Structure formats: structure tokens, C-alpha cells
């Protein structure tokens, strides 16, 4: 069963380092096939992040624990990104305008 997950990294981060980290960490997860090997592709240039899609295959989708394998892979990559100093930015929004608040007095 093929799994996909997109990791977002900062525009200032090293794409090659991030791709290498993704492949290494996912390859080390128990239940991920070595053939075909995990791979990555840069798929998005978003508002706040460069999207790198990972693709990997798990060995036995009938076991019903493919969600556990996917979770382990994503967690391993996140921890590696933290260790390497690779940023996983989130969208920043700025709200503009006014809010008028009238004080109410009453009994």
C-alpha cells in the first residue's frame, strides 16, 4: 500500500537536506518496504512553505496497522527536522479593521 505525506519546510531551509532526512527516516521505520524505496518530490511553493511530498510503501496493508506505520514515519521525520534545525512554518495571517465595543449599562 502506497502512502503519501507532504512536509512543509521554510523557504530558507535546504531542500536537499530535508529530502535526504525524509528518505532516511522513513526508510528506517519498521514496516516500510525497501523496494520500491521511499522517495520525495518538491510539489508545492505555498504561502509560507515549500512542500515536499514523500512516497513510501508499507509491507502488509492487511494487518490494519498501516496508520501506525504512517504515524511512525511522520513522527520520525518531524523529530529529524527538529534535530537538523529545519523549520516547518505555518501560515501567518494579519487581520485588519476595527472592532467597536460599546459599554452597556443596565440594571
Q: What would you call each of these model-derived segments?
A:
Residues 9-13, 35-107:
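Solvent-exposed, non-transmembrane regulatory segments of membrane-associated proteins
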Residues 1-34:
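Soluble accessory domains appended to multi-pass membrane transport proteins
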